[in-house]
Design a protein with these regions (language model features):
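Conserved N-lobe ATP-binding subsite of Hanks-type protein kinase domains
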Residues: 32
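Conserved N-lobe beta3->alphaC-helix segment of eukaryotic protein kinase catalytic domains
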Residues: 44, 49-75
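A short, aromatic-enriched beta-strand patch in the conserved N-lobe beta-sheet
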Residues: 84-85
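Activation segment signature within eukaryotic-like protein kinase domains
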Residues: 122-123
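Eukaryotic Ser/Thr kinase distal regulatory-tail detector
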Residues: 242, 283-409
Length: 409
């Protein structure tokens, strides 16, 4: 682990007045990320702004503390750097490096699916990062395209460590993203680094196929059932080595899942799918990148969605509004509403309850006039009970739909 770089005067206390705030780069569950220029040096950063009232209301303070404590102590080529934090009466601020190539999510959306060599390149950098974190006893727990950024040189950087946690053995916190969630999390049997390698297998499948392996048109229940059954249909055009690797990652039995065995990440790195990879060169960023963003300057935001810097109440809502590309009632391309177009999370609602709150954005779940705004879920025995709350594309309240189904015995 390399020493953490210092960006600001150690003696100086940062405040909002030190920065000239720019455009919004993204919206989150209780805040937004904005481009900002540090007045003393003119350098640009990404500042995550979180409304304190919303953070407390959603019981996310511990997640924020955990993210800060983890990021302040690590430095790695494929992890976004956090350079400082500060706060005022209403808001918590976290200062990150500005990664100007945009989200990996956007690349997948535009390319639909990736050639084997390109997918292998990105999978290499992700595998190195997960291995690095696991060696520090850190489980990431939220791997998905939306949490991967592309830097100016075309390399990946993992961001958003809100669900990351230092784990010695297992943890039982209910968290993750439905399409990427491991079966042991759904069953609430405790999970460890193996959950990250499951998500890695899901992401590799999505890169190569253009959709997640457990996608179900019916929404969450169908996805969870497919995950628990563990049945994956691989497209015929995916090479055999990739299929073999994914079949060893998407294994429900933790004692047989690659990445969670005696050799750890070594089983993955030694797999034939990665035969052409020099891992030391990859770690030093010496492998030729498949795509370099066309960046005009360090403050270029052209690879990010455009957001209106509207009323401040937007920063306090539970979920962000639909991006422009997804607000049409009748989409030109139905694939725009596949699960990988969404930003969905499961959050534990309290320290003692087994209930979860699932936030789903950018997703219509086959309902052209409604999108899922929030879903409160509770696991009791083998039953998963959901109360789904929908809103219209223009933000008006929609129907509430209670459902209870048996997921497992």
């Amino acid at each position: 682990m390399s020493p953490k770089a210092r960006e600001f005067d150690e003696e100086a206390e940062l405040c909002l007045g030190d920065f000239e705030m720019g455009v919004t780069l993204g919206l989150g569950s209780f805040g937004r990320v904005r481009l900002a220029r540090y007045r003393r040096t003119g350098k640009h950063y990404a500042i995550k702004m979180m409304n304190k009232a919303a953070v407390l209301q959603m019981k996310q303070l511990e997640h924020i503390r955990s993210e800060k404590n983890i990021l302040v102590q690590i430095a790695y080529p494929f992890v976004v750097n956090m350079f400082g934090t500060f706060q005022d009466e209403t808001t918590i601020y976290m200062v990150f490096e500005f990664v100007c190539g945009g989200e990996f999510f956007t690349l997948l959306r535009n390319e639909d699916k990736l050639p084997n060599d390109q997918a292998r390149f990105y999978a290499t950098e992700i595998a190195l990062t997960l291995s690095f974190l696991h060696n520090l006893k850190i489980v990431y727990r939220d791997l998905k395209p939306e949490n991967l950024l592309i830097d100016k040189d075309g390399h990946l950087k993992i961001t958003d460590f809100g669900f990351a946690k230092e784990v010695e053995d297992r943890t039982w916190t209910l968290c993750g993203t439905p399409d990427y969630i491991a079966p042991e999390i759904i069953r609430n049997k405790g999970h460890n680094k193996g959950a990250d390698w499951w998500a890695f297998g899901v992401l590799l499948f999505e890169m190569l196929a253009g959709y997640p392996p457990f996608y179900d048109e019916s929404g969450g229940f169908g996805t969870y059932k497919k995950i628990l059954k563990g049945m994956v249909e691989y497209p015929e055009d995916i090479q055999a080595e990739a299929v073999d690797l994914m079949s060893k990652l998407l294994v429900a039995d933790l004692t047989k899942r690659f990445g969670n065995l005696h050799k750890g990440a070594g089983d993955i790195m030694d797999h034939p799918f990665f035969d052409t990879v020099d891992w030391n060169m990859a770690r030093r960023k010496e492998i030729v990148v498949p795509m370099i963003p066309d960046i005009e300057g360090e403050n270029d935001t052209s690879y990010f969605e455009e957001y209106d810097d509207e009323d401040e109440h937007v920063e306090q809502v539970c979920t962000p509004p639909l991006p422009r590309a997804y607000t049409a009632l009748q989409p030109a391309d139905p694939r725009a509403f596949a699960p990988r177009r969404s930003q969905r999370r499961i959050r534990k609602s309290s320290a003692t309850s087994e209930s979860m709150v699932l936030f789903s954005t950018n997703s219509r779940l086959g309902m052209p006039r409604w999108r899922l705004e929030m879903c409160v879920a509770a696991i009791i025995g083998g039953n998963l009970s959901l109360l789904s709350i929908y809103i219209t594309a223009d933000g008006r309240p929609g129907p509430a739909r209670p459902e209870t189904r048996m997921l497992f015995n």
